[in-house]
Amino acid sequence: MQAILKAKPAVGLELGDVPVPTPGPRDVLVRVVKTGICGTDRHIYEWDAWASGRIKPPLVVGHEFVGIVEDTGVAVRSVRPGDRVSGEGHIGCGHCYACRTGQSHICDKVDILGVDVQGCFAPYVCLPESNIWKVDPAICDDQACLFDPFGNAMHTVMAQPISGKQVLVLGCGPIGLMAIGILRAGGADMVIAVDPYPHRRELAKTMGADVVLERADEQTVKRLTDRDGADVMLEMSGSKQALQEGFRCVRSGADVSLLGIPHEEIAIEWAEMVIFKGLTIRGINGRRMFDTWYQCESFLRRHRNLIEPLITHRLPFDRFEEGIHAMQNGSACKVVLDWTDAKV
């Protein structure tokens, strides 16, 4: 079957032929309909330091998808051929302390679809039954294939109370923008979005941000809020500047959730900015399985167009490189690939 591959340890991805996966007794084979291109796929394409240290070619990439169950292993009971499904891309070991206490999203032995195991940028993908998610009929394919990034946003937002809160969002990439939509629908009192790029700030307005700023200026944020700073900070960028400025913009007793991944060491004034202010800080990794998925489904059933403005490019799968280049030059937010015509 045709697939998008990291065929060799170098810059780029290519179309190539790979075998259709065979499901084991507890696996589900899914005929892929739509996929989303993630920033992780871009890192693999660009073969940066992270990718070259983690990825072992040849590898089918991709982890955001929706499709139809084609076949199941003999022990599978929860789905059958013809069911419309997506899937959780973090495959926990099932045996460690985290997995056995409902925290498989932080399993130390996790395998990630399209990173550690063969991914979904192909006509077929195979996942354990325990990772499969039946998609509600009310949710369209283009949005259903984005449950992975939407789930990251949902997990970050729902890690603390947000109803009636004044929230600072640092970074308006796709996940930050999704978080703004969730905050708006979830009853946040004020959403202040920060991003250095004008087109992202415009999208933040579209998603419902009350105020958009080029940088997290302490005096500006404190003037906008009536509580001497934001109640909640969601850090989605991993930017050194954003983190250092953001901690100055929150009130004492604020909640801070960190999803963005820094690529350098960042000095924080821990005593003045964190300890004496009594902040509660949470690290966010992936989606809680499957609490976050239920929350995503509920939101998208009731707010069917919530993330529609963020899908800027819809392309056939064989034009994937066009989508990645659009992400690189900043013209794309979310790119959805159609696998309808892929050859098997």
Task: Put a short name on every predicted segment.
Residues 21-35, 50-97, 136-138:
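Glycine-rich beta-strand-centered segment in the early N-terminal region that forms part
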Residues 197, 262, 287:
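Residues in the short beta-alpha loop(s) of Rossmann-like NAD(P)-binding domains
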Residues 223, 227, 265-313, 321-322, ...:
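C-terminal substrate-binding/catalytic core of Rossmann-like NAD(P)-dependent dehydrogenases/reductases
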